[in-house]
Amino acid sequence: MEEMPERIEIKQKFPSWREMLKPVKEFEEGRLSYLSLPKQVDSEWFKMPFGDVERDFHDLKLPENWKEIFLEAMKDTLEKNRSFKLFMDICVRCGACADKCHYYIGTGDPKNMPVARAELIRSVYRRYFTPAGKFFGEWAGARELNEDVLKELYYYAYQCSLCRRCSLFCPYGIDTAEIVWWLRRMLSRVGLNQRFMTISIEASSRTGNHLGLLPGGMYGAIQQGLEELKDYTGFDLHTYINKKGADILFVAPSADYFATPHWYVMLGYLLLFNELEEKYGLTITWSTYASEGGNFGTFHSYEAAQLLNSKIYKEAERLGVSFIIGGECGHMWRDKHQFINTMNLPPKHEEWRRFWEDPDLGNLAEGLRGVRFDSYASGEHGWIHILEFVAALIEHKKIVVDKSRNDKWIATYHDPCNVARGMGLIEEPRYVLRNVMNNFYDMPEHTIKDKTYCCGAGGGMLADELMDLRMRGVMPRMMAVRHVYRKYGVNILLTPCAIDKAQFPHALEYWKIPIEVGGPMEMVGNALVMTAFGEKPEDRQFDLRGEPLKPEEGE
């Protein structure tokens, strides 16, 4: 992990609103995102305006008419998105959101208060799009758009993870994440894009996944997983890739193909899919084209989000599946629950249409009859979250689990922002965990469920150059984890989000909390008794980490 100071200092500042509108001139190291390179935003697969220029934050190399371009982009946003116009007008600056932002709590920077972050762009809106701002200027809370203001807009637009916790506490329901999303789109129109995010967007548009994995790499990773499972279970398992006529398309975040602890979740998927096929005949395929459920476009711009999520519906139609299961990813679910169905047309093939007229799994596999998806939070657009899927299987007693296999773990659960707040999937993961393990404890109520604190790395904030911001932003979550670690002896933090799993090992190390990180599907895989293969509860000797399920005598 990048070197961090032993102690961090948080200085709370409370300047006047007049002072707040003065653009900052000094930019903190560890909080400033790198700008994109031409190879990310001027490639054959992903092109952004003025992307052919290599920029540095201290030399933006803006186009000559950048101001007109930016304001035209703002005008376009105001005309096409009524919510943005509403959010610009109705804020009364009550401050209810101020201390709800993890970045404000961690940095003490007043411009990281959600109300102030929105005010940075709202002041430009007032100056150019309201009569009061045009006539009274600064007295009406308006300010001129110049290069210093533009730099400040970029600096603070990329100190927000779009987690929407602030919106939960806003009495008017102002969605600051949406404001920041449209602001980032405006910045992209004058050539200002964040490097970390556009690396992932370009790779996904080119190869189908954020990591740039080619089909052979993805296939090899899955085969490696099957070989590992043979060592742990003794069973010869298989999977399908690009199988036409399969019942279900499964889409995972690409980190599950190789990263740790994501890999253990991948093994859990493979065990479950083999059990369901062997026992009920339900076929589930992966795709090398739609090999990424995540969508960094949802943090960048509408156009980028639309480009990336289009491939999933196309692949579902090409393969002729009846529905899609999505894996353990956070922003996948903001995208697939709220965006995809208005950005791209859903599949129209017969198998899809027929299943969603009567969404009973028994129509695909008779032994699963009664498992229905009529009112599932994630089922509105043809998608089912893997944890809702598993919860249904457990509730209807379609799989056998042995909770004692997870007895070495004392777990707590982190609600990913986009899963809990973004789609309302709150109780199902807890239902699954309580059914596959004996030792589970929630963190304090004001830090979980719809009030969950962000991991501090979503929204494009997982970039290495933002390590200071990340460790500060994750502080509220780490304090809650420390509470259950001390009170209950928790030794693993579970989360169904790929970015969380990448962020938390660093955060736990920095905040000196000696516990592991994993995903719920790892616990499901450990507990799952492969009855279709003749396995008995006592047969399994190793967990999905390759460690003994029960400690040796004397340990």
From Swiss-Prot:
The organism named in the record is Archaeoglobus fulgidus (strain ATCC 49558 / DSM 4304 / JCM 9628 / NBRC 100126 / VC-16)
Q: Where is [4Fe-4S] cluster 2 annotated to bind?
A: 101, 160, 163, 166
Q: Name the source's superkingdom.
A: Archaea
4Fe-4S ferredoxin-type domain location, by residue? 82-111, 151-180
Membrane topology per record = Peripheral membrane protein
Compartment(s): Cell membrane
Which InterPro entries is this protein grouped with?
4Fe4S_Fe-S-bd (IPR017896), 4Fe4S_Fe_S_CS (IPR017900), Cys_rich_dom (IPR004017), Helical_ferredxn (IPR009051)
What the entry lists under PROSITE patterns is as follows: 4FE4S_FER_1, 4FE4S_FER_2
Required cofactors, per record? [4Fe-4S] cluster
Q: GO MF terms on file? A: 4 iron, 4 sulfur cluster binding; metal ion binding; oxidoreductase activity
Tell me the protein's name. Hdr-like menaquinol oxidoreductase iron-sulfur subunit 2
Record function comment: Has menaquinol-oxidizing activity. HmeC and HmeD subunits may together mediate electron transfer from menaquinol to an unidentified electron acceptor on the cytoplasmic side of the membrane.
Asked if the record carries the keyword Amino-acid biosynthesis, the reply is no
Assembly behavior: Consists of five subunits: an integral membrane subunit, a cytochrome b-like subunit, a cytochrome c subunit and two iron-sulfur subunits.
Keywords in alphabetical order: 4Fe-4S, Cell membrane, Electron transport, Iron, Iron-sulfur, Membrane, Metal-binding, Oxidoreductase, Repeat, Transport
- Coarsely, its chief localization is membrane
Cofactor stoichiometry and binding? Binds 2 [4Fe-4S] clusters per subunit.
Recorded hits in NCBIfam families, A to Z, give: DsrK
One GO location term (cellular component): plasma membrane
Q: Where does [4Fe-4S] cluster 1 bind?
A: 91, 94, 97, 170
